[in-house]
Design a protein with these regions (language model features):
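The feature marks the mature, well-folded catalytic cores of soluble enzymes
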Residues: 1-179, 185-226
Length: 229
């Protein structure tokens, strides 16, 4: 501010939804169980909404260690980029131990994360190797690689086309390619181009769910955009 810079809140609306829900229910006297990964920025951001009364669980075993001050008002929220299957297992453990727990009205896991995980479940059995385009620090990209591995399909993650290693493709006839929710399309196209250089002869897109949800730009950016039209 001292240098005249402007800040814009570009937090994903799906993450903001979790923050709003936590703040609202906290005022009503609720404690929380949060399903997520310790140290993940989103988890730290959500837990940072409250001074206390929010318990992080990373797996079903952690659920048994939770000791809330009271159980009459207990709610559960999740990190938006979790593995759908892992989150479901942990949620079942939460409901088994705390049958009265309040669940989100709509699931917290990002629709783009879920769509990609559903797609990789269909893709993995059909290919010899899976390449995931995404950052090694991206939770949802790592989950895609994990899902492929559960199907016994060798899987690798690259942040850039230059990271592709030819030895990954030796003896492989069919290559599956997917990308994390925040990976820009240009990176995917660059990986495809590199695969062609390494011998790929055709590219086929599998039918999947068409994502039509669009979120508006942050308010300040919308105003700037209109000013330049």
């Amino acid at each position: 501010q001292a240098r005249g810079f402007r800040g814009f809140d570009a937090t994903c609306p799906l993450v903001t939804k979790v923050h709003v829900e936590v703040a609202k229910l906290h005022k009503e006297g609720y404690e929380f169980i949060m399903i997520g990964h310790k140290g993940h920025p989103e988890v730290e951001g959500t837990m940072g909404q409250l001074p206390s009364g929010i318990h992080l669980v990373e797996d079903a075993d952690d659920v048994q260690k939770v000791e809330p001050a009271q159980t009459q008002k207990l709610a559960v929220v999740t990190q938006t980029t979790l593995s759908v299957d892992d989150a479901a297992d942990i949620m079942n453990a939460v409901k088994q131990r705390f049958p009265q727990v309040r669940e989100p009205k709509q699931q917290d896991i990002c629709y783009a994360t879920q769509n990609r995980q559903d797609a990789i479940k269909l893709l993995s059995p059909q290919v010899d190797v899976v390449i995931v385009v995404g950052s090694p620090t991206s939770s949802n990209s790592n989950r895609l690689r994990d899902v492929a591995a559960k199907y016994g399909t060798p899987s690798y993650m690259v942040d850039h086309a230059s990271e592709l290693k030819p030895e990954w493709l030796v003896g492989k006839r069919t290559i599956g390619l997917t990308a994390g929710a925040s990976a820009p399309d240009i990176l995917v196209q660059q990986v495809i181009a590199r695969l062609r250089e390494l011998g790929a002869v055709s590219v086929r897109t599998l039918a999947g769910i068409q994502e039509t949800i669009k979120f508006p730009l942050p308010k300040g950016l919308r105003q700037i955009g209109r000013a330049h039209v």
